[in-house]
């Protein structure tokens, strides 16, 4: 893969776990931006507009016939009415969008108007009451030859997560069951599907499609978008937080060897903050707020992890919600 090399961020995590397993863990993480511009930008087609959030990337499996490209990158508008799709044959692009999109809100089992959906104050006409489907978390199931997509939206009350499935990665069927809180990021561990939701609440299910059980809350109420990287019994969590100035990407880890109800996270370490104009670094530093942002700001949001051939990639939203960028994560013991 052709790669352009830009300034990297180097950090070291050195944390002493204060748990029943008493050991020291040290890991060096280097994050390297691979291109000097977002790979996804506003107005790439006639439908998508300028708000860009929530990336999730897969390698298209061989059992999908006639794919648009080797890679499918799913993303959304923060207040979107459908899940967007971009495709490419190399990770660094060029990326093109599939203008029709994938899962539409009408297929998702989320309300298409408010009311009947309501915001957190139970107001069908309040500022948080808007129909949407957003923040895809997409996985390939080779066992069932399906693409599994977790999405969130506003239900009749709070924001929640549902799941949709597809045989081709484009046409999805939504499932009606509410699985849990919004912003699922899922991973496999000990024959369960686990999911970390906002704000840091863990869930698990025996089949990944239904009956998610709520477990411990591991993060502060300001935690929102997360991404997960599993290494044996250690889970790295990348995330951003409201009320940061600027909003940036953090990392911590969780020891998965204990009973899941006893899991705790390590202290956070900063991974990445805006450093270039296309990331918003030339804009004023302001405290980030919850919800959508429709103008460029000095913020990074929405981390997502993709792994291929032993390499780890980090996607993230730039300048608030103004594009998606690509970096590589280098892990050394």
Feature roles, as predicted:
Residues 4-5, 17, 185-187:
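Intrinsic low-complexity, intrinsically disordered segments enriched in polar/basic residues
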Residues 1-10:
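Bacterial N-terminal signal peptides that target proteins for export
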Residues 17-27:
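Bacterial Sec-dependent signal peptides at the C-terminal "C-region" and cleavage site
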Residues 25-296, 307-333:
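Beta-rich carbohydrate-recognition and catalytic domains
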Residues 9-19:
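Bacterial N-terminal signal peptides
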Residues 300:
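Iron-sulfur (Fe-S) cluster-binding modules
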